[in-house]
């Protein structure tokens, strides 16, 4: 049996279609998704990337994605790609560019 690991979910949405369908800025849906992911144990790391705060089973992450689809049906027509990755060691490199974390 595999041990639980932190998981990363990344996705890409068709922002043009979102703006046409949602009657406004695509930022609204991204803000709502961020809140949803936060409520479900994921931290926003950048753009459309989220990492689980704690180790979890892949089945739990998949259930979160299913709930995300239910909460935001527009995703069924606007998701261009979505990936789930098991996170190993992570190293913060932002400081190499003179940016404080």
What are the residue ranges of the model-derived segments?
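Generic enzyme active-site microenvironment
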Residues: 10-12
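Basic nucleic-acid-binding interfaces
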Residues: 1-7, 16-85, 90-101
């Amino acid at each position: 049996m595999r041990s639980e690991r932190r998981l990363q979910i990344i996705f890409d949405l068709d922002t043009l279609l979102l703006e046409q369908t949602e009657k406004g800025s695509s930022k609204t849906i991204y803000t709502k998704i961020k809140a949803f992911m936060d409520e479900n144990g994921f931290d926003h790391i950048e753009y459309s990337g989220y990492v689980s705060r704690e180790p979890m089973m892949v089945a739990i992450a998949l259930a979160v994605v299913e709930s995300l689809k239910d909460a935001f049906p527009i995703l069924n027509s606007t998701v261009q790609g979505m990936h789930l990755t098991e996170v190993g060691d992570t190293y913060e490199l932002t400081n190499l560019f003179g940016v404080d974390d």
